[in-house]
């Protein structure tokens, strides 16, 4: 297991408190949301993977926000399409 130092990640995010929030959010995405890691897993836990992604500049709070908005938009579009199909079928 690779040892992770958080200093590089703190420098990418700004402060250690925001780092905790961003890393936890990303780790949760991988664990619960089924998102794939952006770095090799190397048998690491999702929290370590999240920190490595942040260290490499692949994940920031802004990137997570944009991805969440895109996914929400796609989900809303799919729901609208389904409702439209149901409504057209009733005519």
Swiss-Prot record:
Keywords: DNA-directed RNA polymerase, Nucleotidyltransferase, Transcription, Transferase. InterPro entries: DNA-dir_RNA_pol_omega, Pol_omega/Rpo6/RPB6, RPB6/omega-like_sf. Pfam families: RNA_pol_Rpb6. Its EC number is 2.7.7.6. One of its GO terms (biological process) is DNA-templated transcription. The keyword Nucleotidyltransferase applies. Belongs to the RNA polymerase subunit omega family. Promotes RNA polymerase assembly. Latches the N- and C-terminal regions of the beta' subunit thereby facilitating its interaction with the beta and alpha subunits. This is DNA-directed RNA polymerase subunit omega. It comes from Erwinia tasmaniensis (strain DSM 17950 / CFBP 7177 / CIP 109463 / NCPPB 4357 / Et1/99). The lineage of its organism: Bacteria, Pseudomonadati, Pseudomonadota, Gammaproteobacteria, Enterobacterales.
């Amino acid at each position: 297991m690779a040892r992770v130092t958080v200093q590089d990640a703190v420098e990418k995010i700004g402060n250690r408190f925001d780092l905790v929030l961003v890393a936890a959010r990303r780790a949760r995405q991988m664990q619960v949301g089924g998102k794939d890691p952006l770095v090799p897993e190397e048998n690491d836990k999702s929290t370590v993977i999240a920190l490595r992604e942040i260290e490499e500049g692949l994940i920031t709070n802004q990137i997570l926000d944009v991805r969440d908005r895109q996914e929400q938009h796609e989900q809303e579009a799919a729901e609208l399409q389904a409702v439209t199909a149901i409504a057209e079928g009733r005519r």
